[in-house]
Amino acid sequence: MEDNIDKDGPKGHASRSTRKSSRARVSVIGAGYVGLVTGLCLAESGFEVVCIESIRERVSALNSSTVPFHEDGLGTLLRSNLRSKRFIASNDMRSIKRTDMTLVCVGTPSRPDGSLDTKEVLSAASQIGRIIRDKPDYHVVAVKSTVPPGTLESKVIPLIERESGKKHGEDGFGAASNPEFLREGNAVHDFLHPDRIVIGTRVRKAFAELSDLYAPIDAPMIKVTPPAAEMIKLASNAFLAAKVSLINEIGNVCKELGIDVREVAEGIGMDRRIGPDFLRAGCGFGGSCFPKDVKGLAEVARRNGVEPLMLDSIIEVNEGQPLRMVELLERHMKINGAKIGILGLAFKPGTDDVREAPSLRIAKELLRKGAKVYVHDFQAMDGFRRQVPKVITCGSPEDCVRLSDAILVLTEWPGYADPSLYGDKLVIDGRGVTRTKEYDGVCW
């Protein structure tokens, strides 16, 4: 493996790219939230993009202008870039050979011990290596998937070298860690207007080509080593998750003292050292990133002889928050035999994603305690019902309220804010969405 750190600037040097994009042909492996947003935003920037996906039904849907999940703005991008022929979906990995670079955007789910499962990343690396073996031109591989620090250099690059017969460096192929920082529900905006672009590589040519790729985007670019880039992603999510768990724990104390934590959050958020973001106390965080990445980083720490006391506490606090909603409900009424409505199933508004959502744990606990559970969400009911089939889905918030003895509000969709929706029903609010006659908040 060649060590070709760019001598033009120090490690960690941040700059704004002034290079003119050469409009490379790009292949993206994976058409999930990250891969599809990445592919379509690059196509919108003028690149020719092929998005490679193993699920044939998803490929057919995409090429028929159908987005397989909810993400604001994605449908418009898909339709316009299919028309312009800058974007196409395929299940043929050999499409990589006709492109200049490949972005790996496959999932790295949690294993039972909390570690990140990188088998899909390594499978992609092996296939890339075999496909570029006979390709005469230079090829860049950028891993956007979240992986443990050291994965690119210890596993991905050796696999590509072995399968391709090429040497990593300035001649055969170049590799980089290029983590994403997209928020579901705001992913298109976040890709086109990022706070920073992180490129972790030791190869000058790979950095230059990735700089060209991001030239249309006006954002600071930081060049670091691959392990540092991999750690930046995990550490960023750990910091944000820590802020959420800390305000939730403070909120739990405030609740018992009769203090509204929202007033406390406003006051501490005005401190520029703290800032107002991620200070909304509630029933806990969910999604595909925070829980997985904090657990993954904790396991990296353990495997390297560091006891992750704070990382473990972030998860412990978060896993307790949904159950506080149930405990709060029990202060007001007997759950066994009651009809309980849940408004909001997605882990946040603007998405249909229910992965690690507080609603999952709450619904299962209510069912275990003998409640009949009615649910509504503006986007996430199908995905939720697949995981918790015993709930009863409602076609509107009004139906859910009408059929229920009490309501738990778990996602801050604007459609749940009107107090008149609830009448005289008891409302347990986990997100600070509304304020009704019979009302209690999880942290206020």
Predicted regions and their residues:
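Structural/interface elements that position substrates and couple domains in central-metabolism enzymes
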Residues: 2-444
